[in-house]
């Protein structure tokens, strides 16, 4: 199988796997491309299958990652995604092997990734990572698990930052934290705002626009996290209909 690396030089001529057949999110895809190009200056690497498919890995040094974690000298996997008919063909392992090789070449102590305690949309299946030798390093409510593959036994253990342990914020109504990392998050935010305000519920969205903001965030899943009356509700980027059902149970 042929994989290609997406770089600043070729990104405008290549798809980035996200929202492949959704024309309405084209502006959000372009925003993610701009985000990726900026992160590439900070060490982000993006490999994908050389097909029109959602098969890719995206990783960068953990100290540059847009997540509230402490993991000096580790590589952080933003996303490892293999979908549809491409599952169960060894793609995830081969893409992970590229990350491992890069991390070792950089003299790092290991690799980390956030997975779900159970199978959940947009979160990796922890069982694959356990099979690949990853072990649990830290947990945060309600279902986030920080997994690590470590080859330096003297390395400090990766951990979530303390501010995410409370699982709450001091805000009323719906509050959504998000970044440009996922086109679906950027593409949906205005529709979610319109629906929420129509129902008479207070709404605010906070787009994290820097590494520093993301690392200080109260949301573990900075790509997209929904809070209601200060309590974390979900990381799932929902359709309008599904989000309306959620609102009906909350408000």
From Swiss-Prot:
Q: Which UniProt keywords apply?
A: Acyltransferase, Transferase
Mitochondrion recorded as keyword: no
Q: What Pfam family does this protein match (any one)?
A: YoaP
Matching InterPro entries:
Acyl_CoA_acyltransferase (IPR016181), GNAT_dom (IPR000182), Thioredoxin-like_sf (IPR036249), YoaP-like_dom (IPR025685)
Decide whether keyword Transferase is in the record: yes
Q: What class of enzyme is it?
A: transferase
Q: What is its EC number?
A: 2.3.1.-
Name of the molecule in the record: Uncharacterized N-acetyltransferase YoaP
Q: N-acetyltransferase domain location, by residue?
A: 4-152
Picking any one GO molecular function of the record gives: acyltransferase activity, transferring groups other than amino-acyl groups
The similarity annotation says: Belongs to the acetyltransferase family.
């Amino acid at each position: 199988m042929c994989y290609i690396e997406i770089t600043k030089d070729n990104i405008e001529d290549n798809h980035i796997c996200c929202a492949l057949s959704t024309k309405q999110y084209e502006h959000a895809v372009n925003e993610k491309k701009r985000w990726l190009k900026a992160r590439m200056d900070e060490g982000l690497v993006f490999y994908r299958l050389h097909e029109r498919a959602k098969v890719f890995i995206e990783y960068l040094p953990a100290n540059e990652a847009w997540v509230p974690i402490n993991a000096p000298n580790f590589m952080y996997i933003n996303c490892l995604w293999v979908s549809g008919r491409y599952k169960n063909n060894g793609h995830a392992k081969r893409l992970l092997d590229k990350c491992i090789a890069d991390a070792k070449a950089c003299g790092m102590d290991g690799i980390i990734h956030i997975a779900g305690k159970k199978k959940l949309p947009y979160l990796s299946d922890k069982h694959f990572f356990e099979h690949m030798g990853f072990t649990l390093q830290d947990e945060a409510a309600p279902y986030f698990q920080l997994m690590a593959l470590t080859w330096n036994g003297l390395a400090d253990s990766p951990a979530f930052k303390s501010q995410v342990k409370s699982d709450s914020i001091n805000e009323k109504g719906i509050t959504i934290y998000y970044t440009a990392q996922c086109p679906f998050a950027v593409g949906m935010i205005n529709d979610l705002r319109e629906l929420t305000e129509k129902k008479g519920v207070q709404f605010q969205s906070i787009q994290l626009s820097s590494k520093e903001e993301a690392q200080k965030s109260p949301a573990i899943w900075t790509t997209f996290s929904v809070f209601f009356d200060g309590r974390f509700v979900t990381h799932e980027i929902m359709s309008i209909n599904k989000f309306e059902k959620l609102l009906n149970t909350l408000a």
